[in-house]
Regions:
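Gly/Ala-rich beta-loop-alpha elbow adjacent to hydrolase catalytic centers
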Residues: 120-124, 128
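Active-site signature of alpha/beta-hydrolase-fold catalytic machinery across serine-
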Residues: 50, 130-131
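Non-catalytic alpha-helical scaffold/packing segments enriched in small hydrophobic residues
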Residues: 100, 127-130
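Charge-dense, helix-prone N-terminal extensions
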Residues: 3-6
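Serine-hydrolase catalytic machinery in alpha/beta-hydrolase-like enzymes
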Residues: 8-110
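Alpha/beta-hydrolase fold nucleophile elbow
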Residues: 109-121
Length: 131
């Protein structure tokens, strides 16, 4: 298993939302393919962060993204539903926030911006398809 490094990365969506991603990458100097990891409707939780770490262990740089702002996360379905539906109110919200995350990933020194991919889980799957 490769040694990895992790950090939080603050970035801003076009609507002004302060977003906080979780970045994981192998300890290497070579630029790597980058993978965006879009979360389920719960927000950027431990599950999403673990997927980013696993990708890093397999040689990728990964960014688990924040779709709700300020790293909001919940375990309550009513709250998750409310936050998710807020991102549907303006058709540009999902694309703008995901694009901001993708640009943030591409800008990291560890990332080869010519080799990017995205994966998502549940709500995150929609985010990736909209991207």
């Amino acid at each position: 298993m490769a040694a990895i490094k992790t950090r939080e990365i603050h970035y801003t969506a076009p609507d002004g939302s302060a977003l906080i991603g979780y970045f994981a990458a192998p300890e290497t100097d070579a630029p790597l393919a980058g993978v965006l990891v879009a979360p389920e409707w719960w927000g950027r939780n431990e599950y999403t962060e673990q997927r980013a770490r696993e990708l890093a262990e397999h040689g990728y740089a990964a960014l688990a993204i924040d779709m709700y702002g300020d790293k909001k996360v919940t375990t309550h379905s009513d709250q998750a539903y409310q936050w998710m539906m807020q991102t549907f109110e303006d058709p540009d919200t999902i694309v703008d926030r995901a694009t901001a995350a993708l640009n943030t990933l591409a800008a990291q020194d560890e990332v080869n911006a010519e080799k990017l991919a995205a994966i998502g889980f549940c709500y995150g799957g929609k985010v990736v398809l909209d991207l």
